[in-house]
């Protein structure tokens, strides 16, 4: 993983090839986020032109057809709507209105998509929402409809449903990044309140890489196959030495790991990813476990 310092340097580098234009719109500060994306795209040989729009100006950018976003005519528009900011909107609502917060906010985001689609040919990358549990209801938050944790989880679900209906909208899964990194590594209260940044500097490269991976698929660059060894990869042990009865596979001990790995590989196969084998075993020996 590249560091932010490395990404900052890469963002200034020259890359040959046609320009790839990206507009970043957010309800929080996105300067470092945009810089990280530009650096990561250039590290992959993509001549990126990244427009970082002003703080919390999504409506102004999308409603005005003469805005800098539309003038750029971007290949991709990134909508970075941070949980921290909409949490403030949630708290400002009358308690009676909080139960419909997820539905109402989902409609607002879908309207953003419509504006972009009606005024450009841009693809849309939409962030989902990380979780903030204010503990106002404690563990009951998961069953109380007017709690923020209930509404933010519902909003993520509603967004997933809506994105599945739109061919030009793609998810940037911030929640998964938060879970992998851990809340304290992903988010810093001090940074948010002082600089309106919704993620730490350590998190920026991870997010930028995910954006880059999405954009690479737009450009036709993605993994089409996996080449695997057999021994101690698809099963534990060496089939040529241990024999069919001696390799580790199944529900017991290490065998469980290999069984689950095979299940995951099968899910990739079901997606159309080619599974290939490269093994030093004799062909007949290698085929025994199959």
Where do the PLM segments sit?
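Short N-terminal or domain-adjacent regulatory/targeting segments
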Residues: 1-16
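Alpha-helical cap/lid subdomain in secreted, periplasmic
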Residues: 12-19, 34-201, 209-224
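Catalytic nucleophile-elbow at a beta strand-turn-alpha helix junction centered on a G-D-S/GDSL motif
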Residues: 18-35, 231-234
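Short hydrophobic segments within beta-strands
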Residues: 24-25, 127, 278
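Asp-based phosphoryl-transfer active-site loop
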Residues: 224-239
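Metal-dependent catalytic core segments for phosphate chemistry
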Residues: 236-248, 279, 283-290
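Basic, amphipathic juxtamembrane/active-site segments
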Residues: 239-265
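Substrate-recognition element of Asp-dependent hydrolases with the DxDx(T/V) motif
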Residues: 256, 260-290
């Amino acid at each position: 993983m590249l560091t932010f310092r490395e990404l900052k340097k890469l963002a200034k580098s020259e890359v040959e090839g046609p320009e790839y234009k990206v507009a970043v719109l957010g309800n929080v500060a996105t300067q470092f986020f945009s810089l990280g994306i530009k650096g990561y795209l250039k590290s992959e040989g993509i001549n990126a032109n990244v427009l970082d729009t002003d703080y919390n100006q999504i409506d102004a950018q999308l409603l005005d057809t003469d805005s800098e976003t539309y003038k750029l005519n971007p290949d991709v528009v990134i909508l970075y709507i941070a949980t921290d900011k909409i949490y403030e909107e949630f708290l400002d609502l009358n308690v009676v209105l909080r139960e419909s917060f997820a539905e109402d906010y989902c409609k607002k985001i879908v309207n953003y998509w419509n504006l972009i689609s009606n005024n450009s040919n841009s693809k849309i990358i939409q962030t989902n929402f990380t979780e903030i549990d204010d503990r106002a209801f404690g563990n009951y938050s998961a069953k109380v409809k007017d709690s923020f944790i209930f509404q933010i989880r519902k909003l993520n679900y509603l967004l997933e449903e809506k994105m599945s209906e739109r061919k030009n909208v793609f998810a940037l899964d911030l929640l998964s990044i938060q879970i992998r990194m851990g809340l304290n590594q992903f988010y810093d209260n001090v940074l948010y309140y002082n600089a309106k940044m919704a993620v730490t500097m350590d998190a920026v490269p991870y997010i930028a890489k995910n954006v880059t991976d999405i954009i690479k698929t737009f450009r036709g660059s993605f993994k089409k196959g996996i080449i695997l060894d057999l021994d101690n990869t698809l099963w534990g042990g060496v089939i040529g030495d241990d024999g069919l009865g001696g390799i580790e596979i199944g529900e017991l001990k290490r065998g469980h790991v290999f069984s689950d790995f095979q299940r995951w590989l099968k899910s990739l196969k079901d997606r159309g990813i080619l599974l290939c084998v490269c093994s030093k075993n004799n062909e007949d020996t290698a085929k025994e476990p199959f």
